[in-house]
């Protein structure tokens, strides 16, 4: 649609003007993206844009959101990781949280004033939501919960202001997993950076929960019902990861084309050799295939198709 093209073009102009020039220096120095860039993402719909207007969102469809996310990923993958992780968490709070939780946490998250992490992955079970070993037990004295365990490879984990943590609240044989909002500064909660090869400006974190006392009000939804939450939002996340991969691949393809046009060999640009042309054509084919597959998954989500999970 025309409005989608206009939104994409405006975002592309912004990325080229205000984001692309600073990426190299920030990645080399491992500096977090400036907070004003994070806040700017809100205006383009990347923080809460999928939510209905009644919840403060823009009611974007998944195809449009994915297209914008791919553009951001192709420009600065670290900023994309920071934004999409925070958006995932604010979506959970908006759609599954209580009115009190929405009122307390959503406005700042949607403005980009605060950032969030998604605390699922663990050392021994990966992202298997049914097998999490982190536990939360009721605290009779406070009426809240005591959280104990460890999460690993968590995007935004080192610098986020809050996050959603999945913890077992039932026996090991069932899927009684619950979701809790954990805030930075809570006693017993600590985080450290985990080295990663790429995306240096959005470091991964190891999160430790040493008898963290959580208020009862920080439980999202009903006790023991978070397995379905994790499953739903992981499907959503996979769709957008496909867009991200397409965006990064397209950026690499464009760089390859630029290089092939500049690099001289035997008196002419290497892009004039048939072998290089074939390689570039194969790249373009794969980039377009990945983009179309991502769009197919997003369209299935928009149509609420029964086979959406298969495409995601």
Language model features with spans:
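Short glycine/proline-enriched turns and hinge-like loops at secondary-structure junctions
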Residues: 60-62, 128-130, 156-161, 174-176, ...
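A short core secondary-structure module
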Residues: 144-192
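Glycine-rich phosphate/pyrophosphate-binding beta-alpha loops
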Residues: 125-126, 152-158, 236-240
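N-terminal glycine-rich flavin-associated loop
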Residues: 80-100, 126, 138
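Alpha-helical interface subdomain recognition
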Residues: 1-75, 96-101, 108-112, 139-141, ...
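A short, charged helix-loop
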Residues: 205-232
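A short, Trp-centered hydrophobic/proline-enriched beta-strand micro-motif
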Residues: 112-121
